[in-house]
Amino acid sequence: MSTNTDYAALALRVSSGALFIAHGLMKVFVFTIPGTVGYFESLGLPGFLAYLTIAAEVAGGLALILGVATRAVALALIPVLLGAVWVHSGNGWSFSNEGGGWEFPLFWAVIQAAIALLGSGAYALKPSAP
């Protein structure tokens, strides 16, 4: 029998997973892979990190939605989000600022920590151990 906590974990897991997939696919289809690699390099980061970021966002988002290795995936996505905090740190706090501030990626990192603590919740393909 599922509890309210299980359904809360499900809501966080699925909504967060959908956002990760959307952001990963945006890097592929809107910014393009070469554009994303170029952007990473313009920040002084190695270009291969763009590929790792895209893979983490798409695969991690799918794993969250399906409820597979939920705790590990949520924890693994936190460094990606902290990298986004760093990227957006020069734009100020508010995400509505030009270039996007760092409030959204920081909040999203906190959500991943909550998902890691809660586990997969209801309707997971591979439920987390309590």
Language model regions located:
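Extended, low-polarity transmembrane helix blocks
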Residues: 1-29, 47-55, 59-130
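Membrane-interface interhelical connector segments
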Residues: 29-44
